[in-house]
Amino acid sequence: SRLSRLSIATGVPFLVILAPGKGSYFREFLPKEYLEMKGQSENRMYEMWLDQLVLKGLRFLDLNSFFRLYTEVFPKNGIHWSEWAQVDAFNMISDTLLDILPDSLRPARLMIDSSYRSTIMEGTDDDIEQGLNLWRNIPDLEATYYNTHWEDVPAFKRPRILVIADSYAWGLVNKGLLREGYRDSEFWFYNQGVHGPNIVQKGASPQTVHGFSTKA
């Protein structure tokens, strides 16, 4: 493939991530009329991407299949994967990168100190609700959270990476991925907006970075 040839020519490895989608986990909440529409196929886009990645021999990590074995991957009132799932996803991505990076480089992992359950949502776990500008709170389901700290890996040993992704990456960026997990790295939001390692100081969310507000 063109991507593989570019990787070989530049000496820069790449990894494609297949993230889980909320519609695949909560199909019982999708409108019945939509599910019965002619030509509808469950997980069609995921299967299409997976087939092409395998066919072209591209290196990828299938987080969609991994997280299908777990519950509470998505919060009730959130768009994106749960806070705990983001931590597990980051560590899986970093572990996978270890196999393709030079031995002299390795990412820092998010070390899990403890976990707890709460009905008070944190991070992006209620970002649908926040974006709707509602006048009263929507009850949340109990969710799992981790207390974490970054593994102590010297900066010169951490690789620089380029993350090209949609808003699913914001949660990881919020946790310090660009500066603490890796070294002076960048996030290209939809391959349009370019954000560096200090973006977390701005609040690191599409709303704050691009001038949107959740306030009435």
Enumerate the predicted regions with their spans.
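Extracellular glycan-modifying ectodomains
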Residues: 1-216
